[in-house]
């Protein structure tokens, strides 16, 4: 196997090297962008103002963040606002989130591990010709090296603090196409305790990778 993302944690990095061998070369995403291999990008962190809710664990908080109906309505509106600027890939953690988004937007496509591989590939292939297609996919599916270069907008819903997940997720959209050399990334996060901590960690990764990023607080009802 091959990977372009070596984990930051030593025990994970050692496991990776034991499985596929030593690192044979090291080029950062910024270097590949400067060489014209990868698309340029901007990351817009949208911090939804979810009030002062308190949860005793990250799992409880995350469940609320990705299934609360009013929050899903807001997320749906944000994604729809991007649709006229090109194909959009929305990455989510829970199947329940995808189902809720599809209830509101039946013309979108939802891809999860439950979908047959051939059906998944058919949807990916359609992006080659489509212009305003919206694909919702779980992080687990997207982690398996999908190749869909004509993604112009990438939405990350509560991606957490895993270096590999965050960087690999961005990698799904940063590939160039004949009519694409720029990617807009929307990092959807919250002002709640655990989400806020994870967002701070992601900002460190963005800074390390020299990815331009800004943060905007978003009020909603």
Where are these regions (language model features)?
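Short glycine-/polar-rich loops that comprise or flank the Walker A/P-loop
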Residues: 12, 20-23, 38-42, 149-153, ...
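Post-DEXD/H (motif II) to motif III coupling segment of the RecA-like Helicase ATP-binding lobe
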Residues: 1-42, 206
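Conserved interdomain hinge at the start of the Helicase C-terminal
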Residues: 52-104
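Conserved helicase ATPase core of P-loop NTP-dependent helicases/translocases
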Residues: 89, 99-100, 108-143, 165
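Conserved nucleotide-binding/hydrolysis micro-motifs of P-loop NTPases
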Residues: 4-9, 31-38, 47-51, 96, ...
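C-terminal helicase lobe
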Residues: 177-221
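Conserved SF2 helicase motif VI
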Residues: 6, 153, 161-185, 202-203
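Short, high-confidence coil segments that cap the C-terminus of an alpha-helix
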Residues: 84-86, 131-132, 151
């Amino acid at each position: 196997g091959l990977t372009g993302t070596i984990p930051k944690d030593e025990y994970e990095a050692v496991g990776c090297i034991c499985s596929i061998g030593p690192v044979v070369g090291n080029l950062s995403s910024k270097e590949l962008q400067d060489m014209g291999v990868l698309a340029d990008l901007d990351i817009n962190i949208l911090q939804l103002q979810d009030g002062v809710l308190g949860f005793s664990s990250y799992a409880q908080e995350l469940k609320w963040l990705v299934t609360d109906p009013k929050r899903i309505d807001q997320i749906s509106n944000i994604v729809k606002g991007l649709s006229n600027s090109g194909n959009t890939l929305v990455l989510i953690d829970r199947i329940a989130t995808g189902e809720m988004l599809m209830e509101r937007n039946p013309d979108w496509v939802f891809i999860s591990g439950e979908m047959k591989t051939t059906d998944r590939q058919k949807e990916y292939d359609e992006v080659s010709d489509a212009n305003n297609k919206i694909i919702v996919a779980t992080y687990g599916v997207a982690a398996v090296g999908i190749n869909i270069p004509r993604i112009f907008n990438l939405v990350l819903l509560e991606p957490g603090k895993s270096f590999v997940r965050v960087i690999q997720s961005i990698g799904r959209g940063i590939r160039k196409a004949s009519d694409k050399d720029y990617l807009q990334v929307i990092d959807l996060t919250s002002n709640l305790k655990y989400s806020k901590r994870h967002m701070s960690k992601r900002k460190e990764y963005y800074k390390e990778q020299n990815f331009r990023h800004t943060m905007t607080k978003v009020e909603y009802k």
